[in-house]
Structure formats: C-alpha cells, structure tokens
Amino acid sequence: MRVLAIDPGLTRCGVGVIESSSMSLIAVGVLKSSPDLAIEQRLNEIDGQIRGWINLHNPDVIAVERVFSQANLRTVMGTAQVAGISLLAAAQSEIKVVMHTPSEVKAAVTGNGRAKKDQVAMMVQRILKLKEIPKPVDATDALALAICHVWRGSGDERLAKATAKEKTRLSLLRSRS
C-alpha cells in the first residue's frame, strides 16, 4: 500500500510518500505558497502541488493530519483550509482519505502521545532507515503521519471489517430464531 501523507500548512505543507510493504521512503518534501499572494491564490498553488504529488506517486490512500485548536487563529484557519483542499483533491482523485490527530501520530510512532518533535523525528529516521532526519520538521511530520496510518490505520480497517462481519453473522443468527 502506498501512502501519501499531508501535514497541512499554508506557508509550509509537509508531504511524504511511503510504501507500506517495505516500510520505505518513496518521496518527501514541503509544498510552499508565497505569503505575498492573496489567500485564494495561495490555496490554488498548494492545490496544484498536492495534485501533482497525487499524479506522480499514485497513492492508494491519503492521510491528512486532523486540525486541532491552536492559539493562533490565523494559523489554524490556514491549516484547516489546506486540509480541506487536501480532502477535496483526494475525493476528486477517488482516493480514500484517513485523518489522524497529532497525538495519534506521536503515539503510533513513539509509543507516547505527548512525545516531543525531536523524538518523533528520530523514530521516523529509524523506522524508515534514513541516513538523516528530513528537514524541515513539516516533512518529518508528514512521514510520521504516513507511518501512523500504516500501523494504526490498517489495524482500524481490519477491526471495522471484522466488526461488520460479526454483526452480519449475528443478524443472520437472530433471523433464524
């Protein structure tokens, strides 16, 4: 399974692609928009870059970091807007989307939902067997998100399928009685 992960941000948007079968890095980067442009132009720039990554890497799933409340309203608005265009790009490309919170990502990668950025970065480097930690932190965060989905997301999917199967089985048993 190929996972494209997006750590949304208006000025810097981290992106990373990993292959789950080998837990290997395919690509990592940061999408940027100029703060000198109007908001709609910045979003359009990021949208085009996200679609470029989708077309280039052909992911099976797109993981987007769930926006959480931040003290700076301008920052959270830009982050939420980029998350929204990420979801739209995935939907229009007919690619499944999953969302994970920052604490879910930290817990999946380090075992601690309150881990510090440097702890997450070191684990990303180890898990993906990288020579160095990707820079800037937005790129590392995207890779951590991709790892989280591989480890946590696929488990959640198996659990959901098993639950649905059991509900169907129980329903059939009830209808026979």
Residue map of PLM features:
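Phosphate- and other anionic-substrate recognition elements at nucleic-acid/protein interfaces
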Residues: 1-177
